[in-house]
UniProtKB/Swiss-Prot annotation:
GO terms for cellular component: plasma membrane. The gene is rhaT. This is L-rhamnose-proton symporter. Belongs to the L-rhamnose transporter (TC 2.A.7.6) family. It is found in: Cell inner membrane. It catalyses: L-rhamnopyranose(in) + H(+)(in) = L-rhamnopyranose(out) + H(+)(out). The keyword Transport applies. Uptake of L-rhamnose across the cytoplasmic membrane with the concomitant transport of protons into the cell (symport system). The lineage of its organism: Bacteria, Pseudomonadati, Pseudomonadota, Gammaproteobacteria, Enterobacterales. Keywords: Cell inner membrane, Cell membrane, Membrane, Sugar transport, Symport, Transmembrane, Transmembrane helix, Transport.
Length: 344
């Protein structure tokens, strides 16, 4: 496995670790509605940071975006909006299925769809099936899905042991939402594929290859922001017990604390895709579709590790922790199989 591929896998691990931790600051926000908190974090992660970083990287910010036709930008934006719909469905999936089953089904589906649909759309899948490297990377995807399944099983054992139940369990509704979440969340992978002309144009302007994907986030995350912020703003306007005015009528120190914590959560959310771009740039072009598999499987891995570090599994007993550890090991093996496949 060469150095570039190793670093690509490493950067995806760092990005996934940030994704697994980003909600921690949000949990410390007090006396704010979820909609206000999520909107503040979202404005930072989906609007301020993509625009600020792109303005820093590009020699002429507006000229860069004006150089693309609507036929190039629109699919990128719409795939970003597609991801935004998946993001909203994610929370509803947890509500009706519980954390473990919801995450397992949603992440498993988005891992498969987001990883395999790209080479299918690009007409590369048949080639991958008949080359040693392609076969190994596809085997890695299968092993990763097995690893996610094992971690999901560990979560179910933990919830059963600790008496944790879904807020409003509904198998039929939950499964439908989980499938929708998995498919729509893959929009980020599709958006990155559609944004390749934007990445190439940024590189042609002298932007370092590690950063070449970042200017496309203005469009991708703009689509996601439209859906997420629109959802939050509509609820803030329509739901009687939600009020932005009330949220900002708290004591000034608490407002400042909530703003900073929400902004920190937004920063950590953005960093997952900042390092995703670095990992994506380090992977051989013919295997760039594997970025999504690495990100999502590492997200599950890091989520399990973070849970152990935060002592969320202390009262779960030995068996759930053992199953979780096995799942994490399987995901690590999957990443190595993919790395060897890309290097062959």
């Amino acid at each position: 496995m060469n150095h570039a591929i190793t670093m690509g896998i490493f950067w995806h691990l760092i990005g996934a670790a940030s994704a697994a931790c980003f909600y921690a600051p949000f949990k410390k926000v007090k006396h704010w509605s979820w909609e206000t908190m999520w909107s503040v974090g979202g404005i930072v992660s989906w609007l301020i940071l993509p625009w600020a970083i792109s303005a820093t990287l590009l020699p002429d910010f507006w000229a860069y975006y004006r150089s693309f036709s609507a036929s190039t930008l629109l699919p990128v934006f719409l795939f970003g909006a597609m991801w935004g719909i998946g993001n909203i469905n994610y929370g509803l999936t947890m509500r009706y299925l519980g954390m473990s089953m919801g995450i397992g089904i949603a992440i498993g589906i988005t891992l498969i769809v987001g990883t395999l649909m790209t080479p299918i759309i690009n007409g590369q899948f048949a080639v991958l099936m008949h080359t040693q490297g392609g076969q190994m990377t596809l085997l890695g995807v299968l092993v990763a899905v097995i690893g996610v399944g094992i971690v999901t099983r560990a979560g179910q054992l933990k919830e059963r042991k600790m008496g944790i139940k879904a807020e409003e369990f509904n198998l039929k509704k939950g499964l439908l939402l989980a499938v929708m979440c998995g498919i729509f969340s893959a929009g980020m992978s599709f958006a990155m594929n559609a944004a390749k002309p934007m990445h190439d144009a940024a590189a042609a302007l002298g932007v370092d290859p590690l950063y070449a994907a970042l200017p496309s986030y203005v469009v991708i995350m703009g689509g996601g922001a439209l859906v997420n912020l629109g959802f939050c703003f509509i609820r803030l306007a329509k739901v009687k017990n939600l009020s932005v005015k009330a949220d900002f009528s708290l004591a000034k120190p608490l407002i400042i604390s909530n703003l900073l914590l929400s902004a920190l959560g937004g920063l950590m959310w953005y960093l997952q895709f900042f390092f995703y771009a670095w990992g994506h740039a380090s992977i051989p072009a013919q295997y760039d579709y594997m970025s999504w598999m690495l990100h999502m499987s590492f997200y599950v891995l890091c989520g399990g590790v973070v849970g152990l570090v935060l002592k969320e599994w202390n009262n779960a007993g030995r068996r759930p922790v053992s199953v979780l550890s096995l799942g994490c090991v399987v995901i690590i093996i999957a990443a190595n199989i993919v790395g060897l496949g890309m290097a062959s």
